[in-house]
């Protein structure tokens, strides 16, 4: 509960982004016109990024072997002999050999191979938040006002060359920028203004910043009219799913469906705190907190961004029922490889949480797996056969 209270108070100090490349297709489908086929997809392993408690330096990675059914906690430490750091905040599968992890309060971006071996770090992007990539560069949001010798009034986006792990360009955006996505060469950044409670220089943000990814120049800011655009951003082609937390008092949380082709958006009157996509639909678990009642209200919805049709529930009746039984939903994730759906329960926010997995038909993939404190991010790694 300590961590959750910090989350509420700080608004945005705690919570996988990707590029605009299409999701990987299942194995066995033709990869090239010449008839060459990809290896057969046999299954997948999972990495769970546990944030731990902010400022406690107890973040962890958990690894689930889908072949053996064995969960390994403290995975990064067991592989590398050292801790991952304080509050790992995002994890991104960049390519077949590289995974990036923003470790927020340790002020580093840690790189690992899929076997967990550390293979470098970027250390001059403090208070780093979320990531996306085009395969050559990594784009990272930061709440900080400094990157190396550069200073900024607001927050910024850093562009990192993945060959050298060096920052090659930056662009100042809004106050406390959070989620980031890439579409047709344009970066879309959701700004929160989450420090407005302690910084009198600004209010909560309502803008989405558009940045040219090649030149790293600001194209424009789009005012959404929705405050505190904090949390995960899922992307289904041209559409983005963006959460608006509200102010936990009188301004209610909402969510946006943002169309990157037209740079227009639709607003829905419920939050999408935890959200994911199968490439066509958005699946959301919204968490609404009120200081007046000191209580949470949860929402489960499925949204078709092309038609704006909204349905109650997530995926199927089994998953919806299980989500309703959780004490503290903390992440939801659909694998781009199998379309299996995974989600976590943070429980008390101070002790180990649990990972759950189901097929889209509602079949349980494994018994609930004990992970670590605040399991906030999930990444699937495909297992291929010849």
List the predicted regions and their residue ranges.
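Post-signal peptide N-terminal segment of secreted/secretory-pathway proteins
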Residues: 57-135, 147-148
């Amino acid at each position: 509960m300590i961590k959750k209270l910090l989350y509420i108070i700080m608004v945005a100090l705690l919570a996988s982004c990707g590029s605009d490349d299409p999701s990987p297709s299942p194995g066995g489908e033709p990869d090239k016109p010449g008839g060459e086929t990809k290896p057969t997809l046999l299954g997948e392993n999972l990495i769970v990024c546990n944030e731990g408690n902010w400022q406690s330096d107890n973040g962890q990675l958990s690894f689930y072997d889908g072949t053996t059914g064995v969960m390994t906690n403290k995975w990064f430490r067991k592989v590398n002999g050292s801790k991952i750091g304080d509050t790992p905040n995002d994890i991104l599968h960049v390519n077949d050999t590289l995974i990036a992890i923003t470790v927020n309060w340790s002020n580093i971006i840690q790189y690992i191979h899929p076997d967990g071996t550390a293979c470098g770090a970027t250390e001059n992007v403090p208070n780093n938040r979320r990531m996306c990539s085009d395969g050559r560069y990594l784009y990272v949001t930061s709440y900080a006002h400094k990157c190396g010798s550069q200073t900024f009034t607001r927050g910024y986006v850093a562009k990192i060359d993945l060959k050298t792990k060096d920052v090659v360009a930056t662009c100042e955006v809004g106050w406390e920028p959070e989620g980031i996505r890439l579409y047709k060469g344009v970066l879309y950044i959701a700004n929160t203004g989450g420090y407005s409670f302690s910084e009198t220089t600004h209010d909560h943000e309502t803008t989405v910043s558009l940045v040219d990814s090649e030149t790293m120049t600001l194209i424009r800011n789009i005012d959404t009219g929705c405050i505190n655009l904090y949390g995960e951003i899922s992307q289904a082609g041209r559409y983005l799913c963006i959460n608006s937390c509200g102010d936990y008092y009188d301004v209610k949380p909402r969510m946006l469906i943002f169309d990157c082709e037209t740079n227009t958006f639709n607003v829905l009157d419920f939050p999408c705190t935890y959200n994911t996509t199968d490439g066509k639909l958005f699946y959301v678990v919204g968490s609404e907190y009120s200081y007046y009642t000191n209580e949470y209200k949860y929402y489960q919805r499925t949204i078709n961004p092309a038609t704006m049709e909204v349905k109650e529930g997530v995926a199927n009746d089994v998953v919806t029922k299980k989500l309703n039984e959780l004490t503290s939903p903390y992440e939801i994730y659909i694998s781009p490889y199998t379309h299996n759906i995974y989600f976590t329960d943070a429980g008390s926010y101070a002790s180990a949480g649990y990972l759950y997995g189901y097929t889209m038909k509602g079949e349980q993939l494994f018994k609930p797996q004990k992970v670590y404190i605040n399991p906030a991010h999930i990444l699937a790694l495909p297992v291929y056969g010849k």
